[in-house]
Amino acid sequence: MSEKRLIHDSSLDIRLGKCEKDNLNNLWISNGTGLVHYIDVRTRAVRIFRLMSDEKVKLIGDERYHIIQDVPRGLIWISTYGNGLFVYDSQKEEMTHYSYHVDEFNRVNSDFLLYAMGDRTGNIWLGSEYSGIALLSVLNDGATYIYPENEKLVDRSNTIRMVTCMENGDCLLYTS
């Protein structure tokens, strides 16, 4: 029988915390405050990110995040439901926020992102509510928008709940 000693870390005592794992099995804990605690399971380092104001979280009602770690580039992609996309550059320790603005060029086609996925070429796929997919090309900073139905429709027909890539490179879109 082995015995492991548990160490209580009060900084991780996150009231009503909801825990998610990223693609590297690191932990992300949110609790309805707009703060997200990132725990690197290998190094045990803890980093706290403010992704939304308290007011915005109250309007949205439920924080939803999807996180992708792009190890070769040192980037962490964080999609939010209600506040667009954040990209954290771990080498520079800088955060960039992408949000949607009417009548402007946007890397994201909605602030209400439902899913994020990285493909084998390094592109980022963002599924959104009502606005289809934003396919972000990391290498040339471009964005392509994909709509299952007419892009002018503002209803559930363009809601993308999940994107999955198969081993052969085909991508499947899950809609409402």
PLM segments and residue spans:
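Carboxylate-rich, polar loop motifs that coordinate divalent cations or form catalytic acidic clusters
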Residues: 1-176
